[in-house]
């Protein structure tokens, strides 16, 4: 019963191609040897690699030797007819001679012919029929046992039903080969008998053999039987069988079947030569094997499920590029999957027409990857790629910047920068980009792939676009013009370069890199702030000692005009002294502050205002002597000009930056003042050597050698209260300069170097500063500490004569003659031309006098700045007029010294401040007079 069931299953599946088998003759086994060598070299072994269940094919378990003998037969997957099982079946049917079945009647033969033609089930299109035709099974140890059992059952049945058939079978057993002994004729149910057990046995007894005979002997027997069949008038039976219509297929196969007649048509053809029609069959086999190469052998897939439309794609891939490994991987499918057990299929939105046009295009070799030039920035275009695919929508960009589509070369990782490597498909993950709207619209038939520089999954981080605007968006435009909590009211006219630069840098954010964007944002903020300081609004907020106040009620016009006239009086380009201003400066402190902070510059060159806050205690002293204070003089002698504020004030009056890459983060390496060094009164540097008067530098440098040996010159600066108002060269709270320093500030012939900055604005007891050498690290434009820390400014303008001297020797102003609500103040100023230096001290809280002692007095530094903080008056300043030549503004001790360029016709020498001197050098004109 087991054999009968197996034969019945084979009968239902096996006869699958004989309806058209008479049109195309099949070759014998010898010509298929060459096909086996060429086709199976793709698989690299003799064992079966595509073993499918037996019900997919048309042969049973006992046919395995026959299939190995036949080799790779033609598998026609287009019309769904498989001829594999009928190649050997035709020979076995012809070997069952017609003389053995002469008892069969003509109606039976005609019914058998029609049943045979109807019993050919149409197999499924695709690779299933292909695999069933090229299967190579390994040898089964139970083949001999099954053959003997089938022989005994078929012999006993045939002896009862068909007399004389068993002797003929036994006679033929001497002539059959081992391959034909395994052939199992598909049994067909009998129409006359209802037994399900007898019919398979009756069909089996036609092909079961026991003994094995050589190939040559079997061929001679076949030729004899074919000749004998022709003599008995098989042509008449063939004509009758073709004219009959389709009836039922429940008819047993007889010796007069069409398979026998098909074999008789090939009698004159030698066994060693294939027929002419075999060339087309070999080409089809090559096409099918090549499709298996792309589907199975190289990609390592296990279960393969393909559609019917994939057959045309698989066949067309052979002509595309058969010898290339990379083209072979991706030839038969658009999307490649790796790994075992995965299903291979195309996306749902891609049909057969799209794939066919894809592979027939001129750029079939560049379907998956479009390399671009290594040095080009523009995306590569294929002939059939539309220009609209890479043209961006400029309306979405805030700057109207054209965005181009990214080529795979633009998506390379940092490790594989500008590598034109072909994408590899060895890792088992889907390495294709997600199809978007452009891919689905089929306007672009090529889908870009992400390249990889190795066989690892390093293409995952390449999904990001290199445009960093997605990662770091620009600042909101509303908060762009705010600085330390105070709104910056800059001029927003289109002609203003500051506003245009700020708008470009902040609102759009169209920078190349993040560093340049940050630099331009800082630059724009500082420019807006400086522009706001030069053109302030009524409601500008300034904070002083953590207290905000509004200066909208301060009259600005009169104070600016008066101060400008005072400044113009001091220099040759101004009117003579006799034409000095007659009216006094308003006595409101806010007016003086407004004029000092926001006085507009008359020209494009540097015209800063220098602010010095002093703490003199008004007291008259007839002897003109100054007694030093032992408690404060040594602790405050190292305090000097705030270097950062001088550079900030210089930046306010100079031109904009020419290079956008210059940083404003306060680094000393990249200075943004290079393009505007002409506007600087003296060269700003950190290690300065006076090249013109080296002797004077040597005299000053000896004083600080001992201090440099004490500690490191780069002590961390921790005092954040030293940054004063922006437009000030120097501001020292609760201390003052001597006459020499005041003369240099007025003549504008001094340079800036690294100076100590323990200024401690607003503190009642400033800390003891370190030596000068310990605090000479400069932090120019330290944006972290740019604050509006303004003190209560009391202004005082000193007398400056026409010869360029610092002060008049005998200029004395008595405060008792003025309307001044404080203690009488008497200031005696002498010149430094004779080498004098100035010391400050106070004997009590009510009097103070300035004296210029001789240089013979032993001091540690060329100048020291003592602090008098025990008394500070907050009364309003007073203005007076002295001798009609100059105007002196007296206040609570703070002095305002306006500075401008030297008089016209006078060539000042830029005398820089050394790192270790701490004081400006003496001008050659001043030292030559006395």
Swiss-Prot record:
It is a peripheral membrane protein. GO terms for biological process: negative regulation of canonical Wnt signaling pathway; negative regulation of Wnt signaling pathway; positive regulation of canonical Wnt signaling pathway; regulation of canonical Wnt signaling pathway; Wnt signaling pathway. Pfam families: AMER. The keyword Ligase does not apply. GO terms for molecular function: beta-catenin binding; phosphatidylinositol-4,5-bisphosphate binding. Residues 377-399, 413-424 have a biased composition (Polar residues). Residues 1-33, 55-76, 104-133, 161-193, 222-245, 366-454 are annotated as: Disordered. Its main location: cytoplasm. Disulfide bonds: none annotated. It is found in: Cytoplasm; Cell membrane; Nucleus. The keyword Cell membrane applies. InterPro entries: AMER (IPR019003). Residues 222-242, 439-452 have a biased composition (Basic and acidic residues). Keywords: Cell membrane, Cytoplasm, Lipid-binding, Membrane, Nucleus, Wnt signaling pathway. One of its GO terms (cellular component) is plasma membrane. It comes from the Eukaryota. Belongs to the Amer family. PANTHER family: APC MEMBRANE RECRUITMENT PROTEIN 1, APC MEMBRANE RECRUITMENT PROTEIN 2-RELATED. Regulator of the canonical Wnt signaling pathway. Acts by specifically binding phosphatidylinositol 4,5-bisphosphate (PtdIns(4,5)P2), translocating to the cell membrane and interacting with key regulators of the canonical Wnt signaling pathway, such as components of the beta-catenin destruction complex. Acts both as a positive and negative regulator of the Wnt signaling pathway, depending on the context. This is APC membrane recruitment protein 1. It comes from Danio rerio (Zebrafish).
């Amino acid at each position: 019963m087991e054999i009968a069931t197996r034969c019945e299953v084979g009968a239902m599946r096996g006869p699958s191609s004989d309806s058209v088998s008479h049109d195309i003759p099949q070759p014998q086994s010898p010509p298929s040897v060459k096909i086996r060598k060429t086709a199976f070299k793709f698989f690299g072994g003799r064992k079966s690699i595509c073993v499918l269940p037996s019900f997919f094919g048309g042969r049973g378990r006992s046919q395995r030797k026959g299939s190995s003998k036949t080799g790779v037969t033609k598998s026609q997957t287009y019309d769904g007819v498989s001829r594999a099982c009928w190649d050997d079946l035709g020979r076995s049917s012809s070997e069952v001679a017609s003389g053995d079945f002469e008892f069969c009647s003509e109606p039976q033969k005609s019914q058998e012919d029609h049943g045979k033609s109807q019993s050919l089930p149409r197999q499924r299109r695709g690779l299933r029929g292909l695999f069933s035709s090229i299967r190579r099974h390994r040898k089964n140890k139970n083949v001999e046992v099954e053959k003997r059992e089938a022989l005994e059952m078929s012999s006993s049945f045939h002896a009862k039903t068909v007399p004389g058939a068993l002797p003929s079978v036994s006679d033929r057993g001497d002539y059959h080969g081992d391959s034909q002994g395994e052939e199992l004729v598909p049994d067909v149910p009998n129409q006359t008998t209802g037994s399900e057990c007898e019919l398979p046995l009756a069909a089996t007894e036609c092909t079961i053999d026991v003994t094995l005979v050589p190939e040559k002997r079997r061929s001679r027997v076949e030729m004899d039987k074919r000749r004998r069949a022709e003599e008995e008038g098989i042509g008449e039976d063939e004509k009758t069988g073709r004219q009959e219509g389709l009836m039922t297929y429940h008819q047993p196969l007889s010796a007069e079947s069409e398979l026998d007649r098909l074999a008789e048509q090939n009698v004159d053809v030698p066994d060693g030569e294939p027929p002419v029609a075999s060339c087309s069959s070999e080409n089809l086999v090559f096409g099918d094997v090549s499709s298996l190469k792309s589907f199975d052998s190289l990609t390592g897939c296990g279960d393969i499920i393909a559609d019917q439309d994939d057959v045309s794609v698989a066949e067309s891939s052979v002509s595309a590029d058969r010898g290339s490994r990379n083209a072979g991987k991706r030839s038969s499918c658009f999307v490649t999957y790796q790994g075992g057990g995965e299903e291979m299929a195309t996306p749902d939105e891609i049909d057969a027409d799209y794939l066919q046009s894809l592979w027939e295009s001129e750029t079939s070799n560049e379907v998956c990857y479009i390399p671009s030039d290594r040095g080009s920035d523009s995306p590569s275009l294929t002939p059939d790629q539309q220009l609209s695919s890479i043209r961006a929508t400029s309306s979405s960009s805030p700057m109207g910047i054209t965005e181009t589509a990214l080529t795979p070369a633009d998506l390379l990782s940092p490790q594989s920068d500008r590598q034109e490597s072909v994408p590899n498909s060895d890792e088992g993950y889907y390495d294709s980009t997600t199809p978007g709207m452009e891919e689905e619209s089929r306007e672009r038939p090529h889908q870009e792939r992400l390249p990889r520089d190795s066989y690892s999954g390093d293409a995952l981080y390449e999904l990001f676009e290199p445009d960093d605007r997605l990662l770091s968006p620009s600042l909101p435009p509303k908060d762009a013009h705010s600085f330390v909590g105070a709104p910056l009211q800059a001029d927003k006219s289109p002609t203003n370069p500051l506003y245009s630069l700020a708008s470009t840098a902040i609102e759009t954010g169209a920078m190349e890199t993040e560093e340049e964007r940050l630099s331009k944002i800082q630059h724009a903020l500082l420019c807006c702030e400086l522009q706001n300081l030069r053109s302030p609004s009524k409601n500008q907020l300034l904070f002083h000692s953590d207290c905000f106040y509004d200066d909208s009620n301060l009259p600005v016009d009169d104070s600016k005009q008066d101060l400008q006239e005072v400044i113009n009086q001091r220099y040759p380009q101004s009117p003579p002294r006799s034409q000095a201003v007659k009216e006094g400066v308003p006595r409101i402190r806010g007016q003086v502050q407004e004029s000092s902070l926001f006085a507009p510059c008359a020209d494009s060159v540097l015209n800063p205002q220098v602010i010095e806050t002093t703490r003199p205690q008004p007291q008259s002293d007839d002897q003109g002597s100054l007694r030093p204070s032992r408690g404060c003089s040594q602790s405050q002698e190292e305090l000097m000009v705030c270097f950062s504020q001088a550079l900030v004030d210089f930046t306010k009056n100079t031109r904009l930056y020419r290079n956008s890459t210059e940083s404003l983060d306060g680094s000393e390496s990249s200075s943004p003042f290079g393009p505007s060094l002409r506007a600087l009164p003296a060269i700003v540097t950190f290690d300065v050597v006076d090249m013109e008067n080296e002797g004077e530098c040597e005299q000053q440098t000896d004083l600080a050698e001992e201090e440099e040996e004490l500690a490191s010159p780069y002590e961390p600066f921790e005092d954040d209260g030293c940054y004063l108002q922006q437009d000030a060269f120097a501001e020292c709270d609760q201390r003052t300069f001597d006459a020499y320093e005041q003369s240099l500030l007025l003549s504008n012939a001094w340079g800036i170097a690294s100076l100590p900055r323990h200024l401690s604005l607003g503190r009642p007891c400033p800390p003891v500063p370190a030596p000068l050498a310990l605090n000479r690290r400069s932090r120019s434009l330290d944006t972290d500490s740019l604050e509006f820390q303004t003190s209560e400014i009391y202004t005082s303008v000193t007398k400056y004569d026409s010869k360029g001297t610092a002060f008049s020797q005998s200029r004395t102003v008595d405060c008792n003659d003025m309307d001044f609500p404080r203690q009488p103040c008497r200031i005696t100023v002498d010149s430094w031309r004779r080498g004098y230096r100035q010391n400050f001290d106070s004997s009590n809280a009510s009097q103070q006098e300035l004296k210029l002692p001789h240089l013979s007095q032993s001091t540690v530094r060329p100048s020291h700045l003592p602090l008098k903080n025990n008394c500070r008056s907050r009364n309003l300043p007073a203005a007076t007029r002295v001798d009609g030549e100059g105007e002196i503004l007296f206040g609570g001790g703070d002095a305002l010294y306006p500075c401008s360029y030297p008089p016209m016709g006078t060539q000042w020498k830029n005398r820089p401040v050394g790192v270790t001197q701490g004081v400006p050098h003496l001008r050659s004109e001043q030292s030559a007079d006395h």
